[in-house]
């Protein structure tokens, strides 16, 4: 017997679908259900690596954690990673498939439907409940013929489907009623109710709005979910960086350069959650003023990012910067002396001089390193605890001369190893490595912050589990009767 599917679709991108699925996964887990998330297709450069070295969207991995299980590629069989220049790398079942333009992908999309159904069927045979997430809007009419992620999934699974709208962006009636109007009759029959998300203020003030929605749609409003600040969960898309949360007026400032095709920017969430630390995403060298450190993040297209840095005037600004400079993955490659792409792995190929802040050279190859990784930092301030993280990269970087490595890798996947990674300048001010997630290691993160002059709070700040906090918030808005209906087996 196949498990039922509960599906969440939204009126647009960024209305809270991923967050709601995360909450529902935790609520189902707390009820003793074996539950798994599913998103047929995701578009994001924020990726996670599974235990068997495959890529899925970071948001899906977060949902799996909320469900109390390890993430697998079945939960996100298709991942689209924008590369710039109107091309994207298509990851199918965790491995690179093709680098395609949007037109090429559209023409070849139909052959991926069997990938979607095979993986969804596997989850339904393994778990008690699957909670699926759509993408964008289910009624982009010009895109519906190629749909493999929204209502086609709902129809295939005969999923009980929730429609979510974001009242904070305005136009909630047009969002929800307009979407329902544009659904096909057989699709509309699958909608079990609507959720009004991100309401600021007392939800009871929207009582008339609930009545209007229910009378005009003929469907129940399952809940009005109030705005919740500081979720403590990774954002899925780089659009979140365009509207950063209000930061404290003072504190230790860490500048992160908002490079084109920025990837895995959730690397820096643990820094932002430390009391007295301000993470500021910047686009211009003048914004380096007052920063104790600057970080170059991962990117999907390193050579394009290098040209962007030069055009924006960051070359001299970074060479003259007196604080700490860090590069993670693609950012590490940018800190070196030369970047070469002889096989056009990133698209157009070519080579460029790096920033020249570390004595390394990077050469791109077609082999892609995707592993969960354990390493030891080769610096005294990092402590002796092994560092947990992951690698996702296609280039290999080679240190020149006697330049010291920053990390010693001791395990990739389940295989013990011994390999150097990264590089650090002779004065310790500039360093970089390929290890994503490095700042999630508490001893390492706080050791580095102390070097920058950060003073930890005298009394540790207690933080509630973000999954339980989110789940409690959503449960209070929906109520037990609605949750019972949504999670019936």
Curated annotation (Swiss-Prot):
A family per Pfam: CbiA
Record GO biological process: cobalamin biosynthetic process
Pathway: Cofactor biosynthesis; adenosylcobalamin biosynthesis
GO molecular function (one): ABC-type vitamin B12 transporter activity
Key words, A-Z: Cobalamin biosynthesis, Glutamine amidotransferase
Tree of life domain: Bacteria
InterPro entries: Class_I_gatase-like, CobQ/CobB/MinD/ParA_Nub-bd_dom, CobQ_GATase1, CobQ_N, CobQ_synth, GATase_3, P-loop_NTPase
Record domain GATase cobBQ-type: where: 251-444
Family statement drawn from the similarity comment of this UniProt entry: Belongs to the CobB/CobQ family. CobQ subfamily.
Primary role: Catalyzes amidations at positions B, D, E, and G on adenosylcobyrinic A,C-diamide. NH(2) groups are provided by glutamine, and one molecule of ATP is hydrogenolyzed for each amidation.
Protein name as it appears in the record: Cobyric acid synthase
Source organism (scientific name): Chloroflexus aurantiacus (strain ATCC 29366 / DSM 635 / J-10-fl)
Lineage: Bacteria, Bacillati, Chloroflexota, Chloroflexia, Chloroflexales
Protein's gene: cobQ
């Amino acid at each position: 017997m196949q498990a039922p599917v509960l599906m969440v679709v939204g009126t647009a991108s960024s209305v809270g679908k991923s967050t709601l699925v995360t909450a529902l996964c935790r609520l189902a887990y707390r009820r003793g259900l074996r539950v798994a998330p599913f998103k047929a297709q995701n578009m994001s450069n924020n990726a996670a690596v599974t235990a068997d070295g495959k890529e899925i969207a970071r948001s899906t991995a977060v949902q799996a954690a909320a469900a109390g299980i390890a993430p697998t590629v079945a939960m996100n069989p298709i991942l689209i990673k924008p590369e710039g220049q109107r091309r994207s790398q298509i990851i199918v079942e965790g491995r690179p498939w093709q680098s395609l333009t949007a037109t090429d992908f559209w023409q070849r999309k139909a052959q991926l439907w069997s990938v979607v159904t095979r993986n969804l069927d596997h989850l339904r045979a393994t778990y008690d409940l699957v909670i699926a997430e759509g993408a964008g809007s289910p009624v982009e009419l010009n895109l519906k013929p190629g749909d493999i992620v929204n209502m086609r999934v709902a129809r295939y699974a005969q999923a009980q489907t929730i429609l979510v709208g974001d009242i904070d962006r305005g136009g909630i009636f047009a969002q929800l009623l307009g979407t329902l109007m544009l659904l096909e009759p057989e699709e509309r029959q699958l909608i079990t109710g609507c959720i009004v998300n991100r309401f600021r203020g007392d939800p009871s003030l929207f009582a008339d709005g609930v009545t209007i929605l229910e009378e005009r749609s003929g469907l129940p409003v399952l809940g009005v979910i109030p705005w919740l600040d500081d979720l403590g969960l990774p954002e899925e898309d780089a659009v979140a960086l365009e509207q950063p949360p209000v930061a404290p007026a003072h504190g230790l400032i860490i500048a992160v350069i908002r490079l084109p095709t920025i990837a895995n920017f959730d690397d820096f969430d643990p820094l932002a959650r430390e009391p007295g630390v301000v993470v500021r995403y910047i686009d211009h060298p003048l914004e380096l003023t007052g920063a104790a450190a600057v970080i170059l993040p991962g990117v999907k297209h390193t050579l394009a990012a290098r040209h962007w840095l030069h055009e924006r005037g960051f070359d001299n600004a970074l060479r003259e910067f007196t604080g700490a400079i860090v590069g993670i993955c693609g950012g590490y490659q940018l800190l070196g002396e030369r970047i070469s792409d002889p096989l056009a792995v990133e698209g157009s190929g070519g080579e460029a001089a790096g920033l020249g802040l570390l004595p390394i050279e990077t050469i791109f190859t077609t082999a892609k390193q995707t592993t969960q990784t354990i390493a030891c930092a080769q610096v005294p301030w990092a402590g002796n605890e092994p560092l947990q993280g992951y690698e996702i990269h296609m280039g290999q970087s080679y240190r020149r001369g006697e330049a010291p490595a920053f990390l010693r890798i001791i395990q990739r996947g389940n295989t013990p190893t011994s390999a150097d990674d990264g590089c650090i300048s002779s004065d310790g001010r500039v360093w970089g490595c390929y290890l994503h997630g490095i700042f999630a290691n508490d001893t390492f993160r706080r050791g580095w912050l102390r070097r920058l002059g950060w003073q930890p709070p005298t009394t540790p700040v207690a933080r509630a589990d973000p999954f339980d906090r989110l789940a409690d918030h959503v449960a209070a808005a929906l109520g037990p009767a609605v949750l019972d209906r949504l999670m019936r087996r």
